[in-house]
């Protein structure tokens, strides 16, 4: 199975799927903000940044998927982004499921001074909502619960792809081939 996953990771389609899915989810978030009028909170902004990290990872490997170092960089960036997104989503979910006056998220994003994304791209990274509010649901799951599911899937898939890159598999001996 690992050999098959390694072969898949050398195909452009896998990395296109990663880049496209994260871009589609980012576009959906922007539609929720500007089309439906839902206000993003600070944690939503951080989750968007993690999704953009996944898009960048997919784009890096899409350039030349057969080059091992590019695949490794893309997998590392994608795994880092998906794990950070999952951890932020868990924190966000905790704020929504267990609201308390002492558990609040900040109002201004805490980006490094050298990368003030909320000032450079305010149409994407400017938070205007509260983290405690659940504004949308689908099939009984809130948007944050869906993000936990999505980031979990990304973590599992990218972890398996990374393991397939570093573990050597034995070639199967075939009788008639």
UniProtKB/Swiss-Prot annotation:
InterPro entries: DiS_bond_form_DsbB/BdbC (IPR003752), Disulphide_bond_form_DsbB (IPR022920), DsbB (IPR050183), DsbB-like_sf (IPR023380). It comes from the Bacteria. The chain crosses the membrane at residues 15-31, 50-65, 73-90, 146-164. GO terms for biological process: protein folding. It is a multi-pass membrane protein. Keywords: Cell inner membrane, Cell membrane, Chaperone, Disulfide bond, Electron transport, Membrane, Oxidoreductase, Redox-active center, Transmembrane, Transmembrane helix, Transport. Residues 1-14, 66-72, 165-177 are cytoplasmic. Disulfide bonds join 41-44, 105-131. GO terms for cellular component: plasma membrane. It is found in: Cell inner membrane. GO terms for molecular function: electron transfer activity; protein-disulfide reductase activity. Required for disulfide bond formation in some periplasmic proteins. Acts by oxidizing the DsbA protein. Belongs to the DsbB family. HAMAP family: DsbB. This is Disulfide bond formation protein B.
